[in-house]
């Protein structure tokens, strides 16, 4: 989630990424079983400030709740700035989450401390295009087979979970009319093909079925299918060829708002994040468009 607010005052209290006015963003952490008050800033000039809060980690094991702001006595929120008109939805896996992006060692394990969605290709792209962005992502998830999953597929792959508001709660179904993107970017397939045992026909059929789901939700959106920067060799060729086939099939069927984009495979030249994931430095370079 991302929350933006404007307020009058000098002090405010609320693991999130915080940006105040034009200052560099910073991360705050809190871990409490009960409601917590976290101070975001003190000693600000007593004037209007713009504050943005972004959930920096994936909410697979946690259910973040924002209860509100505490302001100086007698101070209040003011009318917020208009949101950007452009809207993008990103659907993906750990690369989209920002898994290990602040780590400096490929051998590091996953920790919430080094995950940061703010520095992912998704968030950076949205900021550069002055767009709102909505991310639906979970580490290890696939289009039909999660990381090292069975050949026949995983019951909790992205198409099965896509309808849920929260990954860990199947009771609340998301209302897709609440956010209608102009562009949907889908980066799935890395986990499906990262280990042996995948089925190529199941991979293609899952891509096709999920595309129809997304198209049904957003009839006018441009849908962009991506290959991620962690794919290499046989897996990269397979996913590229499968997505090219998907795009061709959909174009011939009359869906002309389908596009392809391949990220440049990472080489280690710019370092790695945890578990060989992209580093913050790598994600500031430009992928190669097709």
Regions found by a protein language model. Name each.
Residues 36-42:
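Exposed aromatic-hydrophobic patches
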Residues 1-3, 7-16, 284-289:
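Conserved small/polar residues in nucleotide/adenosyl-binding loops
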Residues 33-34, 45, 49, 56-64, ...:
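Conserved SGNH/GDSL esterase-like catalytic core that processes O-acyl groups on lipids
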Residues 89-90, 133-136, 182-187, 223-226, ...:
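Structural recognition of the beta-strand scaffold that forms the well-ordered cores
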Residues 56-87:
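Exposed low-complexity, polar/acidic, P/S/T/G-rich flexible segments that act as propeptides
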